């Protein structure tokens, strides 16, 4: 929708408080649209409860976990742990966005609705992992305690526009990660569960993406700078997970989430929707940010080409060894 600017003067006048107020109507419209298309679903319906067995501890018939019990592939197990631990930090994410967006009006209603929907993801993933014995339950809990005990601080907590820009890309990145994890898991039950979660993440992305588009109509220079900063410095919210760098490298090789996927399936779709390189009428700082964004995307694509070549060479070596 087109927003009438309140003509507050220079970009410096656009404080977070004024932007929140100016975008309130957009948030309300997007919230109403979201509620019409979002479908409620029951996490327990996606869990293979009949596969469950007691673990050792308080039950005499408890059976210790063993890697061979899992139907999930190795890369699927790695990605599932990273994805679940990322979802587990929901209390910190809620605190971040509630503090920034507020708890009143349409903003507050969205914050609480988003939190409630996201809460399903951690519930169903943990139930699936434990019931199907896909992961070591003791290590999973140790990872959860370690990760959540560190807390979470968003890189973009200083700015409402940066935060909106970040979640527009991050929600899509999370959707893609869940979807690809399902494809690589080797278990149709897991794939179906993660497809359901990915549907939620996509709707969340659409909400923030549309909000970001509206922000461009109000404060194009500031929004362009925010998008530039977020894209150039992007990192997933689970970056603080113990062993994240090694897991991320394995997920890249396993084609769950890597540089090519990040460029083609996450950054480009949002930037194309915003027609980011076609926006004109920008001031000097906005133009500079737009140019730097274009240069960064070109550089990222070139790096992705190198990654693709290395990955193809690795696959060829592995195929040769398998055929030997």
Per-region residue spans from a language model:
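Non-heme di-metal
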Residues: 2-324
């Amino acid at each position: 929708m087109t927003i009438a600017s309140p003509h507050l003067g220079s970009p410096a006048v656009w404080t977070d408080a004024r932007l929140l107020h100016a975008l309130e109507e957009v948030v309300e419209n997007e919230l109403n649209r979201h509620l019409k298309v979002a479908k409620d679903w029951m996490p327990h319906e996606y869990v293979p409860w009949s596969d469950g067995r007691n673990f050792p501890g308080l039950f005499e018939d408890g059976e210790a976990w063993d890697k061979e019990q899992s139907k999930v592939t190795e890369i699927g197990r790695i990605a599932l742990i990273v994805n679940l631990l990322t979802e587990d930090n929901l209390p910190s994410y809620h605190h971040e966005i509630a503090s920034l967006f507020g708890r009143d009006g349409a903003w507050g209603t969205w914050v609480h609705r988003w939190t409630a929907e996201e809460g399903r993801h951690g519930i169903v993933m943990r139930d699936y992992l434990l019931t199907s014995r896909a992961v070591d339950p003791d290590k999973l809990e140790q990872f959860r305690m370690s990760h959540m005990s560190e807390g979470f601080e968003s890189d973009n907590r200083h700015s409402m526009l940066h935060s909106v820009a970040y979640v527009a890309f991050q929600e899509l990145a999370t959707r893609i990660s869940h979807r690809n994890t399902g494809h690589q898991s080797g278990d149709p039950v897991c794939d179906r569960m993660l497809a359901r979660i990915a549907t939620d993440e996509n709707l969340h992305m659409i909400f923030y993406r549309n909000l970001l588009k509206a922000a461009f109509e109000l404060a194009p220079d500031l929004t362009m700078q925010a998008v530039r900063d977020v894209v150039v410095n992007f990192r997933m919210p689970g970056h603080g997970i113990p062993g994240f760098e090694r897991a991320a490298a394995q997920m890249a090789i396993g084609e769950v989430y890597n540089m090519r996927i990040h460029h083609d399936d996450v950054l480009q779709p949002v930037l194309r929707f915003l027609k980011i390189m076609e926006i004109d009428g920008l001031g000097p700082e906005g133009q500079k940010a737009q140019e730097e964004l274009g240069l960064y995307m070109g550089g990222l694509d070139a790096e992705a080409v190198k990654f693709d070549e290395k990955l193809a060479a690795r696959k060829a070596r592995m195929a040769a060894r398998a055929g030997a």
